[in-house]
């Protein structure tokens, strides 16, 4: 996995450096290539130039900055209120479930939220004589 990532990074660096050398040294005394590249850049400029249909009209903007600030303030107040209450939802329910585990449980030291060890649990259920 690590070697695959290294190879991808190496190929990306190699292609970027070869692309940079190709554009910088593409003319090499060839006037036809220089002329072609210049005409392409001019064509690109013409395509991107604004149309001569007339001056652009500014888009009318609604003054929603006051409403937006009030909305952000309300959301911030709601968040702070919930943060002061403490954990809610799924996390608090899972915390109650973890506390209700029987203390004589064989593997109670490994029972915590979000953790499963299938191999050890199945191995401990069956007593293997080796």
UniProtKB/Swiss-Prot annotation:
Keyword terms of this UniProt record: Amidation, Cleavage on pair of basic residues, Hormone, Secreted, Signal, Sulfation
Family matches, as InterPro entries: CCK-like, Gastrin/CCK, Gastrin/cholecystokinin_CS
GO terms classed as biological process: axonogenesis; digestion; neuron migration
Region Disordered, annotated ranges: 40-59
Localization in the cell: Secreted
PTM annotation: The precursor is cleaved by proteases to produce a number of active cholecystokinins.
Phenylalanine amide modified-residue sites: 118
Entries under PROSITE patterns matching the protein: GASTRIN
Tissue: Highly concentrated in the duodenum. Also localized in more distal parts of the small intestine.
Maturation propeptide residues: 21-48, 122-130
Record family assignment: Belongs to the gastrin/cholecystokinin family.
Entry protein name: Cholecystokinin
Organism: Struthio camelus
